[in-house]
Swiss-Prot record:
<feature type="binding site">
    <location>
        <position position="522"/>
    </location>
    <ligand>
        <name>Mg(2+)</name>
    </ligand>
</feature>
<feature type="binding site">
    <location>
        <position position="344"/>
    </location>
    <ligand>
        <name>ATP</name>
    </ligand>
</feature>
<keyword id="KW-0812">Transmembrane</keyword>
<keyword id="KW-0067">ATP-binding</keyword>
<dbReference type="GO" id="GO:0005524">
    <property type="term" value="F:ATP binding"/>
</dbReference>
<dbReference type="GO" id="GO:0008556">
    <property type="term" value="F:P-type potassium transmembrane transporter activity"/>
</dbReference>
<feature type="transmembrane region" description="Helical">
    <location>
        <begin position="219"/>
        <end position="239"/>
    </location>
</feature>
<dbReference type="InterPro" id="IPR036412">
    <property type="entry name" value="HAD-like_sf"/>
</dbReference>
<keyword id="KW-0479">Metal-binding</keyword>
<comment type="function">
    <text>Part of the high-affinity ATP-driven potassium transport (or Kdp) system, which catalyzes the hydrolysis of ATP coupled with the electrogenic transport of potassium into the cytoplasm. This subunit is responsible for energy coupling to the transport system and for the release of the potassium ions to the cytoplasm.</text>
</comment>
<feature type="binding site">
    <location>
        <position position="395"/>
    </location>
    <ligand>
        <name>ATP</name>
    </ligand>
</feature>
<protein>
    <recommendedName>
        <fullName>Potassium-transporting ATPase ATP-binding subunit</fullName>
        <ecNumber>7.2.2.6</ecNumber>
    </recommendedName>
</protein>
<keyword id="KW-0633">Potassium transport</keyword>
<feature type="transmembrane region" description="Helical">
    <location>
        <begin position="616"/>
        <end position="636"/>
    </location>
</feature>
<feature type="binding site">
    <location>
        <position position="348"/>
    </location>
    <ligand>
        <name>ATP</name>
    </ligand>
</feature>
<dbReference type="InterPro" id="IPR044492">
    <property type="entry name" value="P_typ_ATPase_HD_dom"/>
</dbReference>
<keyword id="KW-1003">Cell membrane</keyword>
Length: 682
């Protein structure tokens, strides 16, 4: 993946974010964040008081009130800046995608075939169902499905990956994306969307996040922050009459400063930025999430359904041996296996043809001259083959061939069953070959488990995440590979229906399930899963069913998606802990200063030894504003993440962000108080 990464504090983004922070001072924007809206109202009130004091309309220190007002406005501006920086990063990423969109003309075909009459029309005039022809050098004008032809396609503008990919009619590699370029040959494409609905348009809309909806956890935390704010607002409002009754009324400026320091402004100011940054980090991993809800769900996942091929194993199974049934020559088995694989373009199919050629010098034959009919593999039949004259050759899984043979009046030999078990015990995949009602033998396919995958699964297990391997292999093969890879469970001989049933079973137990998929047959399971990562190379149906799209089409990315989701949740939790701990420490600065005249006994709480009530209040307000600035990089980048158990993670965060949140204000407020005192500003 070669997409350009943005610096954490890109200068151009910082400049734009500063302007946006000022624009966000509008009350129409501020009211969306109740905590910061209270600060905004307090800033406005103290500003009016400072003006009135300066004009002589009110008694009091105009200088002190103005200083408090300025830093309250800075508090609002810094919170706005944090959100604007996160949004700016997303918009910059969206702008890079907008550069992919180009105004172009399309060759619209009057009939769905290569040699049909062509009309040249603007690409934006194409509608769902229109058929277009694209040739080498052309930009694909719309999202669609290839209905004829095959071509090499450069998708680097979308995926960031420079290596071209093959797109062809039929199968799971027929989906194309508008904005990509044809490098060779030609394609006939049926458009699957209307203008403005393309994958690229949806990517841009998702990345810009202008209408980003709050996630459930974010809403719950916002409600908690509002509740705390209301409690402190009521508490502060009741203080004035008590102090007035005692004869030493606390000024409105001090009460506003007290309220702002009591309410959780730190997390209140950073909450939106954390959510936007989470989606931005997901894009940094070349994964497009449809919403923050999807990213958050990834952090809560506790079951991962992982495809064996390409995720757990290297995915390039190769034919390693022909094992004939009793009474069958190995050459006869090899000949039938090669015939059944002549039109099979999968790596496994090509390896069978090559092995037959190497062992017995069997050459490929022309299917057209043989008047043969190829029978393609489907997820339902789980076998493929060829019909030549009176010969009906099939290869496939053990159960599929068993049903096929018995349906044709034959029986499955016991010696082949034993061979199947032996091959499976060795971790290889047995493919059974049959001609008509007769079983000819087995093809042994070997795959290799990826290095380091067992350790990654052990880390996931520590975090309380269950890993389940999904494979079309039989149970013995699946069990051998599962044991070697270290997964917790497996689903063998998987069908789309079995995957869907498994997801529903886990969800009925209260678990959150994540999975990947790329084919149309994966769409029902993707739609059911809580986190569904569709491969960009997959079909349109799969991409529409998922709530994330992996531009690299790498099934292993699911583990990284979960890590990013957990990092977002950890960042939010850590900064919430830090914010609340911060507030506790600030009480020791501002409460003695605010009420020392009313209740002299509160002076014993001035454990920091702050110079004066004015310097204490101003120091607390300044610290309250500056801490938001210092935490912006952490909110954008996320806290450091380690794969630990929930209890270990909680202990670690309480030590770092809980204790840190208590200590930092003591140091920071005392340092600011010393600077104010030494400079003579108070």
């Amino acid at each position: 993946m070669s997409r350009k990464q943005l610096a954490l504090l890109e200068p151009t983004l910082v400049r734009q974010a500063l302007l946006d922070a000022v624009k966000k001072l509008s009350p129409m924007v501020q009211w969306r964040n109740p905590v910061m809206f209270i600060v905004w109202v307090g800033s406005l009130l103290t500003t009016l008081l400072a003006i009135a004091m300066a004009g002589g309309a009110l008694t009091g220190s105009a200088t002190f009130t103005a200083a408090v007002s300025i830093w309250l406005w800075f508090t609002v501006l810094f919170a706005n800046f944090a959100e604007a920086m996160a949004e700016g990063r997303s918009k910059a990423q969206a702008n890079s995608l907008k550069g992919v969109k180009k105004t172009a003309f399309a060759r619209k075909l009057r009939a769905p075939q290569h040699d049909a009459t062509v009309d040249h029309v603007p690409a934006e005039d194409l509608r769902k169902g229109d058929v277009v022809l694209v040739e080498a050098g052309d930009i694909i004008p719309c999202d669609g499905e290839v209905i004829e032809g095959g071509a090499s396609v450069d998708e680097s503008a979308i995926t960031g990956e420079s290596a071209p990919v093959i797109r062809e009619s039929g199968g799971d590699f027929a989906s194309v994306t508008g904005g990509t370029r044809i490098l060779s040959d030609w394609l006939v494409i049926r458009c699957s969307v209307n203008p403005g609905e393309t994958f690229l348009d949806r990517m841009i809309a998702m990345v810009e996040g202008a209408q980003r909806r709050k996630t459930p956890n974010e809403i719950a935390l916002t409600i908690l922050l509002i509740a705390l704010t209301l409690v402190f607002l009521l508490a502060t409002a009741t203080i004035w009459p008590f102090s007035a009754w005692s004869g030493n009324a606390v000024s409105v400026t001090v009460l506003v400063a007290l309220l702002v320091c009591l309410i959780p402004t730190t997390i209140g100011g950073l909450l939106s930025a954390i959510g936007v940054a989470g989606m931005s980090r997901m894009l940094g991993a070349n994964v497009i999430a449809t919403s923050g809800r999807a990213v958050e769900a990834a952090g809560d996942v506790d079951v991962l359904l992982l495809d064996k091929t390409g995720t757990i194993t290297l995915g390039n199974r190769q034919a390693s041996a022909f094992l004939p049934a009793r009474g069958v020559e190995e050459r006869t088995l090899a000949d039938a296996a090669q015939l059944s694989s002549l039109a099979d373009e999968t790596p496994e199919g090509r390896s069978i043809v090559v092995l037959a050629k190497q062992r017995f010098n069997l050459r490929e034959r022309d299917l057209q001259s043989l008047h043969a009919t190829f029978v393609p593999f489907t997820a339902q039949t789980r076998m493929s083959g060829i019909n030549i004259d009176q010969r009906m050759i099939r290869k496939g899984s053990v159960d599929a061939i068993r049903r096929h043979v018995e349906a044709n009046g034959g029986h499955f030999p016991a010696d082949v069953d034993k061979q199947v078990e032996e091959v499976a015990r060795q971790g290889a995949t047995p493919l059974v070959v049959a001609e008509g009602e007769k079983v000819l033998g087995i093809i042994s396919l070997k795959d290799i488990v990826k290095g380091g995958i067992k350790e990654r699964f052990a880390q996931l297990r520590k975090m309380g995440i269950k890993t389940v391997m999904i494979t079309g292999d039989n149970r013995l093969t699946a069990a051998a590979i599962a044991a070697e890879a270290g997964v917790d469970d497996f689903l063998a001989e998987a069908t789309p229906e079995a995957k869907l049933a498994l997801i529903r079973q886990y969800q009925s137990e209260g678990r959150l399930v994540a999975m990947t998929g790329d084919g149309t047959n994966d769409a029902p399971a993707l739609a059911q899963a809580d986190v569904a990562v569709a491969m960009n190379s997959g079909t349109q149906a799969a991409k529409e069913a998922g709530n994330m799209v992996d531009l690299d089409s790498n099934p292993t990315k699911l583990i990284e998606v979960v890590h990013i989701g957990k990092q977002m949740l950890m960042t939010r939790g850590s900064l919430t802990t830090f914010s609340i701990a911060n507030d506790v420490a600030k009480y020791f600065a501002i409460i003695p200063a605010a009420f020392a005249a009313v209740y002299p006994q509160l002076a014993m709480l001035n454990v920091m030894g702050l110079h004066s009530p004015s310097s204490a209040i101003l120091s607390a307000v300044i610290f309250n504003a500056l801490i938001i600035v210092f935490l912006i990089p952490l909110a954008l980048k996320g806290v450091s993440y380690r794969p630990l158990s929930a209890s270990a993670m909680l202990r670690r965060n309480l030590w770092i962000y809980g204790l840190g949140g208590l200590l930092v204000p003591f140091i920071g407020i005392k340092a600011i108080d010393l600077l104010l005192t030494l400079s003579g500003l108070v």
